[in-house]
Each structure stands twice: as structure tokens, then as C-alpha cells.
Amino acid sequence: RILDIDLYLHATKEDVFFEDDKEIGMISLRVATSMDIMSPEGVANSGRMENSAGGINEDEIWGKQAHWCDYSGVVDGKMVGVTLFDYDENYNHPVRWHARNYGLLTSNPFSTNCFNPELPKTGYNLKKGNSLIFKHRVYIHAGTTEEAKVVEKYQNYINPPLITIK
């Protein structure tokens, strides 16, 4: 299954400032608890996160830039997953990811310092009368990241086939 989500932000009455904060995201998901990487009690679970940069799970993904991030795990005895794709023309692409082993995954285009204190504070000021568009694809799949051909599906998203009608 594929969902394409286009988010249009327009500052109609005044400037809108998006803080450099890990809680700001343009698209988020929570997976079934059986897909969590760690249970709330700290017990290893069936889940696994992977991103386009080769990062695995929270320690290697949280706050890092990537074109996409996949969360896979077992639901009702079957390996399934969901991938968030960040469109290559989005502001601050590739985004940083607020990714947690307890099942949370969020793309965050506005923040740097909250993820890495050595980087400058950023944020974004959307001026009155201006707009900002974010495009994302949600890919819901069977199998692991590799089995679901996530890399190929991302390439299809950013380089769609050209169709000529004669």
C-alpha cells in the first residue's frame, strides 16, 4: 500500500516560526507495540528500524539525516513494515529523524541543535503570505526492508516513470 501525503502550510495572518525542537515533525507514525524494538520494560522485541544512510535502530537513526526511514516488525505472526519517504524537493531534505525504539518515527525538517548541540540552532520562519509544501510517501509493506525493496520504491517515488499519451 502507498499513501502520498502533501502538506501545504500558508501563513495567512502573521509570520509562523517553527522552533528547533525534536517534537516538531511534518509526518509521524506509531507502529503496533509488537513491532517496537524494545518493550517498555526494556525487553528486546521484533522491531527493527533502518534508514537510507544504513543506520539501524534509534542509536544510529535518531537525529540523523536520511531520505527515508523504515520500521519493520512482527504483527500477528507476519513480518510487516512501514516506510516514510521524504521527497527530494522538501525543505531541508534529507530531513533529520526523531526515531525511537518504542515505535515512534517522525521526520523533522526544522531542527538541528536539539539533535546535536554542536550544530547551530535553526528553526524556520514562514513569512506572512508565504507557503511551504511538504511531500511524503508512506509505504506499507510485507517483509523486511530488503524484502520489500524499499530502496527501489524510494527511487520510483523521486523518479516516477514518464508517461506519453499518443
PLM regions and their residue ranges:
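Beta-strand-rich recognition/accessory modules
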Residues: 83-166
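Active-site/ligand-binding surface loops and adjacent short beta/alpha elements
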Residues: 17, 21-92
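Acidic, contiguous internal or C-terminal segments within carbohydrate-active enzymes
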Residues: 1-21
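Intrinsically disordered, low-complexity acidic/polar segments
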Residues: 16, 38, 143-147
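Beta-strand elements of well-folded, non-transmembrane domains
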Residues: 9-13, 31-35, 138-142
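Asp-box/BNR beta-propeller blade signature and adjacent active/binding-site loops
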Residues: 1, 35, 78, 103-109
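Beta-strand secondary-structure signal
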Residues: 4-8, 28, 133-137
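Solvent-exposed loop and beta-edge segments used for protein-protein assembly and interaction
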Residues: 1, 21-23, 128-132
